[in-house]
């Protein structure tokens, strides 16, 4: 059975939008928050706290999304989210913004597969018991040829889902998705397609 996930769009799909969407159209199977950016301060911004306030997400399946390249920052946020009742987190390796990629975050981290592998290893070694992690990814930063190596890394870890946008970071949302890259996806986790989904006419 097909499921409908509401992907995040910064500045648009915050908690008020989620509440209104669910009330008017019925709830999506999952809502992903706009990304939270845990860092060395070990604090969330006010707007981030609003996004993850359990009272703002009552009755909805909400998955907080994290954008970072440091396992220790991810794990700090995981502990905070676990304490608020969340049991699934999404690791954002898909946001194509140049300012994100330049910091080796999002798909910027995909250009450094050893760092990505080490980050995932530390995350899964330190997660709170009962917390699961899904990954939202592009198929590479600069070249679709990066995809087989990245896919081999993802296959090493017990992801709850692998969400794939079959474009590289440099393509942003332009051109035709690399359907062959999506067709190559296989692993020990459910795979979810993202990008260029249109209603039939």
Describe each region flagged by the PLM.
Residues 1-201:
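Flavin-dependent oxidoreductase catalytic cores
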């Amino acid at each position: 059975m097909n499921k409908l996930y509401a992907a995040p769009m910064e500045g648009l799909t915050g908690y008020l939008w989620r509440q209104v969407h669910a009330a008017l159209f019925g709830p999506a199977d999952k809502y992903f928050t706009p990304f939270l950016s845990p860092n060395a301060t070990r604090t969330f911004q006010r707007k981030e706290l609003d996004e993850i306030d359990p009272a703002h997400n009552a009755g909805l399946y909400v998955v907080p999304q994290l954008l970072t390249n440091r396992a220790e920052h991810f794990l700090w946020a995981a502990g905070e989210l676990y304490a608020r009742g969340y049991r699934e987190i999404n690791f954002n390796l898909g946001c194509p913004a140049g300012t994100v990629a330049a910091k080796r975050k999002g798909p910027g981290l995909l250009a450094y597969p050893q760092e990505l592998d080490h980050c995932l290893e530390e995350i899964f070694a330190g997660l709170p018991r009962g917390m699961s992690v899904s990954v939202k990814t592009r198929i590479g930063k600069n070249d679709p040829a990066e995809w087989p190596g990245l896919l081999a890394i993802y296959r090493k870890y017990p992801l709850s889902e692998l969400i794939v946008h079959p474009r590289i970071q440099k393509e942003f949302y332009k051109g035709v998705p690399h359907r062959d890259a999506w067709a190559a996806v296989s692993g020990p986790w459910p795979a979810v397609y993202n990008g260029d989904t249109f209603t039939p006419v």
